[in-house]
């Protein structure tokens, strides 16, 4: 094989220039109202305030590691147990209360749709660092 046939078989097509691609794509600009912009920044403020409020808490204290201490009495044979008396049947209303499930409470967490509590004032716009 000579060099001219090798170049022809391995040559790749050139990509179109970026200006050609931009002309083909339709360009649409969505107009955004001031109310939508303010709502967006309000959501960002609530996220930042919630992060500061939730992240500022110190971590809960850790429980000390369990260090078992055994004695020889722990390994001694237990005395034979007597048969327990048969359990008494509870009344119907007690049985229903016993088997009833407790009402579900919402899990505490981050809800961005809720305004922050009044005790944690929001950061004013003038205090924010410029972008």
Curated annotation (Swiss-Prot):
Residue segments, region Disordered: 1-33, 51-131
Positions with biased composition (Low complexity): 116-131
Gene Ontology CC annotations of this record: nucleus
Keywords: Nucleus, Plant defense
Domain of life: Eukaryota
One GO-annotated biological process of the protein: regulation of systemic acquired resistance
Record localization: Nucleus
Motif range (Nuclear localization signal): 12-15
Family classification: Belongs to the NPR1-interactor family.
Description of how the protein assembles with itself and partners: Interacts with NPR1/NH1. Interacts with NPR2/NH2.
Protein name per UniProt: Protein NEGATIVE REGULATOR OF RESISTANCE
Organism: Oryza sativa subsp. indica (Rice)
Chain's gene name: NRR
């Amino acid at each position: 094989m000579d060099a001219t046939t090798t170049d022809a078989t391995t040559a790749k097509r050139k990509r179109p220039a970026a200006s050609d691609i931009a002309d083909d794509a339709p360009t649409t600009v969505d107009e955004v109202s001031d109310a939508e912009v303010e709502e967006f920044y309000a959501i960002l403020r609530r996220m930042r305030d919630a992060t500061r409020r939730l992240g500022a808490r110190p971590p809960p204290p850790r429980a000390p590691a369990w260090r078992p201490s055994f004695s020889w009495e722990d390994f001694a044979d237990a005395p034979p147990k007597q048969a327990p008396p048969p359990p008494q049947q509870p009344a119907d209303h007690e049985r229903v209360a016993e088997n009833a499930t407790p009402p579900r409470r919402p899990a505490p967490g981050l809800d961005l749709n809720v305004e922050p509590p009044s005790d944690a004032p929001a950061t004013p716009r003038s205090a924010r660092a410029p972008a």
